[in-house]
Regions:
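Short alpha-helices
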Residues: 19, 96-136, 141-153
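Histidine/acidic-residue-rich, glycine-tolerant segments that coordinate divalent metal ions
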Residues: 64-117
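Flexible glycine-rich surface loops and low-complexity tracts that mediate binding to linear polymers
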Residues: 454-468
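A residue-level signal for conserved active-site and pocket-lining positions in enzyme catalytic cores
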Residues: 62, 208, 392, 461
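Accessory interdomain/linker segments of ATP-dependent helicases and helicase-like nucleic-acid enzymes
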Residues: 379-437
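Beta-strand/loop nucleic-acid-binding surfaces
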Residues: 434-451
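Hydrophobic helix-and-loop "lid/oligomerization" segment in the mid-to-C-terminal part
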Residues: 1-60, 80, 131-355, 374, ...
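A common structural junction motif
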Residues: 328-332, 359-366
Length: 469
């Protein structure tokens, strides 16, 4: 059969295509792939793409990291003679698409004991099942665990149960990976220690950047290439996309903060902002930062041709999706879950929407929700040594649902204090008795003038041996 793999433009989608395409290639099948353009097509299947696939005479379309909610699109594929296998990990709606097979760990009739796999985790289960069916050796699917691990950690799924095993074993393979593209992007990220943090903060942003700012094809080609020069060029391109993403994000963030301060938006229960020329690919990241900074739900909209398209982020205890459901008469389209949403609205309805959303937040008594810091233990600086910090690594890999241990330190004296990165971050040295440690507070630079050398403070933080290059 002539096969095409239809994936998403994020790291989970890219790694899903990589694993399935590579596995099929080893079986003698040259499957092609299709990744939608984030800005022009959006997430998931769309009918024009399905019609293009049919026109190119594909017999079988396999979706990865998408498809579970694409009822109409798969119905159209059937009409055009393209058979479909859906593999996905997103929540299942009231009905399933009419596909040959629908593989989703969140199916209500699913007997598999773990529901929290990433999209690439579901693909891994598919190639594992195929390997068993074809009497292949275990190594024929286990060899892809390095790529599966990258997608799993990057998609911020809970790193518990099978995801913990995938990540733990996968990171071991990552350290000795034969994948030239993965080796190259790891080197470009500048991390000496290859752990979940290096993947989350070094590798994932670079792989995601091309999908946000251009087209995700380049990240996929990086994983599939065996050509040294091509890998070098693709890595350089991803680095350029990442720098562009950072600059664009900084511009939107500064613009958003200016709006908040000029219009006293932070006095509202929720922060809803709109801007011309805001890049749709990065406003979700900025919304996360606004929510983190003000501890309020935020929705950012980029305006174009009388339409606002945007992303929202919430705080624990406030269901953003439920709140939007109560305002849906003013919206063209919305989707997502309790903590993160996507939204489309006519520009003329934005002010009315802001008022309605504010009323919903008032009814939910959102002002009574306070930020909570979960502390694992209270310790002294004298308890810290290299062996103690290294012993925490037994709890790795850290990530969603398995956070780094958080410690409380009481009564520390500030020995030095300054801002870093143009006032963005806070750098301190802290003293207790004769013990001194250095500390960094990411995105806490605004506190630099609130404290001075000699002040006594309580600090909540995490411990690590600084290995960043």
């Amino acid at each position: 059969e002539k096969i095409i793999i239809y994936g998403d433009y994020d790291v989970d989608g890219i790694t899903s295509i990589t694993v399935l395409k590579s596995f099929l290639k080893d079986r003698g099948i040259d499957a092609k792939y299709y990744i939608p353009n984030r800005i022009e097509e959006g997430y998931g299947l769309n009918i024009p793409a399905v019609e293009k696939i049919a026109k190119e005479k594909y017999d079988l379309m396999i979706t990865v990291d998408c498809g579970i909610s694409c009822i109409e699109e798969i119905r159209r594929a059937n009409e055009l003679g393209v058979q479909t296998i859906v593999t996905d990990h997103h929540e299942v709606g009231e009905s399933l698409p009419e596909a040959l097979a629908v593989v989703d760990c969140k199916r209500k009739d699913n007997k598999y004991p773990f529901r929290e796999l990433a999209g690439v985790g579901v693909v891994f289960k598919l190639i594992q099942a195929l390997s068993i069916k074809l009497n292949l050796e275990e190594k024929e699917y286990l060899k892809y665990l390095d790529i599966v691990c990258i997608g799993t950690i990057s998609d911020i799924v809970p790193l518990v149960d099978e995801n913990r095993v995938i990540s733990k074993l996968g990171l071991m393979l990552v350290k000795q990976t034969k994948n030239m593209g993965l080796r190259s992007i790891l080197n470009a990220s500048g991390y000496k220690k290859i752990d979940s943090g290096a993947i989350s903060f070094g590798v994932a942003p670079r792989l995601n950047a091309c999908g946000r700012m251009g087209h995700a094809d380049e990240a996929l080609k990086l994983f599939l290439s065996n050509n040294v020069n091509e890998v070098y060029d693709l890595t350089a391109s991803l680095n350029d996309f990442n720098r562009l993403r950072q600059e664009t994000e900084k511009h939107i963030y500064e613009d958003a903060i200016k709006q908040i301060e000029e219009n006293n938006e932070d006095k509202n229960r929720a922060i809803i902002l709109a801007g011309n020329n805001w890049h749709h690919g990065v406003i979700g990241i900025v919304a996360s930062k606004i929510t983190e900074m003000y501890f309020k739900p935020s929705i950012l909209l980029c305006l174009e041709d009388g339409i606002g398209k945007g992303s929202g982020r919430s705080i624990p205890g406030f269901d953003l999706h439920d709140a939007l459901t109560k305002c849906q008469s003013l919206l063209e389209k919305f989707g997502g879950h309790a903590m993160a949403i996507g939204i489309t609205i006519k520009q003329e309805n934005i002010e009315k929407f802001k008022q309605e959303f504010e009323n919903v937040a008032k009814q939910e008594q959102i002002e009574n929700i306070i930020p909570i810091v979960n502390i694992d233990a209270k310790i002294n600086l004298s308890d810290i040594n290299k062996e103690m910090v290294e012993s925490l690594s037994m709890l790795e890999p850290f990530g969603e649902a398995n956070k780094m241990p958080v410690f409380l330190f009481k009564n520390l004296k500030i020995d030095s204090i300054r801002a870093l990165s143009e006032g963005k971050h806070l750098k301190l040295t802290l003293k207790q008795n004769n013990m001194i440690v250095s500390a960094i507070g990411f995105n806490l630079g605004k506190l630099v003038n609130d404290y001075k050398i000699g002040d006594k403070i309580d600090v909540v933080g995490m411990l690590e041996i600084n290995s960043f290059n």
